[in-house]
């Protein structure tokens, strides 16, 4: 080999070594940056800062689509930031590899979308995994009972004729209620009592304008239902409704039918499906007591907040409010035709029943 060829060969080897060195360095740097990115994302995730953690997990999933942990973290971030439909794909990848938290979030996701049978399966799997690790299962057993209750309720979905809906700002929902005088009137608590502080509660006043029902916060910081009567042009005789109605949770948004004894209200306790649910009770004049409240069925109640049931008998119209499928700060006011004789939706079509229970559309 002549000197020239030797130098060329040596130069090529040096070049290859340099390339290998650079590639190795870049791979090492990439690995370090990935580790730093993962650590930072996990820190944000554990702090509940899902929106901030989401971009990092998205990149990690793109690089390693089969990684079960990345899929679970990214799926949870999507769920917690409102992208529930998109989250399902990633949570299912994690669940296939038995990632514990994936089952919990799939249970929640299926519950939110009225797939209660599947939600029951996911929560049962989650409970079984917790039990194997000797972790507390009680909160999730209670959640499972809530899912089973929702499934039973969907099976008994009422055939309700909903004729219109209106999306409004949450604080302005009462503007959608158009009651005739004989049905009484509704006001915000802060407006009726002329308070500067806004309050998420309402006041119902009867047609005679001599009796009110309203919700007010107690020293324990939950809403309870009260009533007052007008005495000599002044409101007085304040009474809290009995504990058959009020509870350790929140009771709010009362409305009294023109018979003066039937009361609709919303509660966050008593086995609700999620948030506020609608209930009805009746005052027994002979015993001076209220009957055990009855939870309304679907489509009136949902996994979201449902409240302010009002029926104007003279108009033969009813209203109720729900934040189901609505962005933060918005609610939907549904207008329906009341039916004194409750009728079940008679169909074996599960998708139709799910659609009518959730009010996916109004036809």
Language-model features and meaning:
Residues 66, 98-99:
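Short helix-capping/linker turns of helical repeat alpha-solenoids
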């Amino acid at each position: 080999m002549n000197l020239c060829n030797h130098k060329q060969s040596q130069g090529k080897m040096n070049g290859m070594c340099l390339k290998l060195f650079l590639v190795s360095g870049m791979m090492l740097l990439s690995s370090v940056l990935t580790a730093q990115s993962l650590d930072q994302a996990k820190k944000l995730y554990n702090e509940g800062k899902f929106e901030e953690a989401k971009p990092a997990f998205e990149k990690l999933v793109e690089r390693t689509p089969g990684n079960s942990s990345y899929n679970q973290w990214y799926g949870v971030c999507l769920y917690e930031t409102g992208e529930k439909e998109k989250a399902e794909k990633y949570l299912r990848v994690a669940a296939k590899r038995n990632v514990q938290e994936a089952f919990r979030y799939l249970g929640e996701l299926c519950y939110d979308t009225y797939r209660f049978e599947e939600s029951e399966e996911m929560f049962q799997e989650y409970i079984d995994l917790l039990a194997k690790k000797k972790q507390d299962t009680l909160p999730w057993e209670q959640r499972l009972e809530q899912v089973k209750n929702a499934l039973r309720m969907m099976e008994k979905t009422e055939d309700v004729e909903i004729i219109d809906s209106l999306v409004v700002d949450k604080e302005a929902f009462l503007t959608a209620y158009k009651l005739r005088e004989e049905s009484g009137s509704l006001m915000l608590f802060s407006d009726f009592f002329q308070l500067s502080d806004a309050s998420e509660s309402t006041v119902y006043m009867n047609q005679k304008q001599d009796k009110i029902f309203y919700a007010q916060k107690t020293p324990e910081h939950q809403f309870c239902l009260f009533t007052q009567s007008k005495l000599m042009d002044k409101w007085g005789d304040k009474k809290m409704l009995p504990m058959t109605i009020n509870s350790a949770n929140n009771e709010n948004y009362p409305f009294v039918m023109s018979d003066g004894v039937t009361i609709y209200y919303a509660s966050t306790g008593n086995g609700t499906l999620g948030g506020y649910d609608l209930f009805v009770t009746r005052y027994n004049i002979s015993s001076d007591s209220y009957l055990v409240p009855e939870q309304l069925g679907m489509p009136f109640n949902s996994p979201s907040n449902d409240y302010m049931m009002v029926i104007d008998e003279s108009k033969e119209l009813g209203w109720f409010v729900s934040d189901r499928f609505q962005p933060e700060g918005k609610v939907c006011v549904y207008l329906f035709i009341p039916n004194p004789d409750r009728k079940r939706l008679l169909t074996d079509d599960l998708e139709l029943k799910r659609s009518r229970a959730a009010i996916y559309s109004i036809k």
